[in-house]
Amino acid sequence: GFKQFVHSMGKFGKAFVGEIINPK
């Protein structure tokens, strides 16, 4: 549901920010 959507968006956001801060 909505909670799961928010959770996956949070995971995606963290990965995205992580790539900006610490690119591979």
From Swiss-Prot:
Q: Listed GO cellular component terms?
A: extracellular region
- Going by the entry's taxonomy, the superkingdom of the source organism is recorded as Eukaryota
What Gene Ontology terms for biological process does this UniProt record contain?
defense response to bacterium
What is the predominant subcellular site recorded for this chain? Answer: secreted
Q: What does this protein do?
A: Has antibacterial activity.
- Protein family (similarity comment): Belongs to the gastrin/cholecystokinin family. Magainin subfamily.
Q: Which UniProt keywords apply?
A: Antibiotic, Antimicrobial, Secreted
Q: In which tissues is it expressed?
A: Expressed by the skin glands.
Q: Where is the signal peptide?
A: none
Specify the protein name: Xenoposin-precursor fragment B1
Localization, per the record, is: Secreted
Cystine crosslinks: none
Keyword Secreted (UniProt)? yes
Is this entry keyworded Calcium?
Answer: no
Name the species this protein comes from. Answer: Xenopus borealis
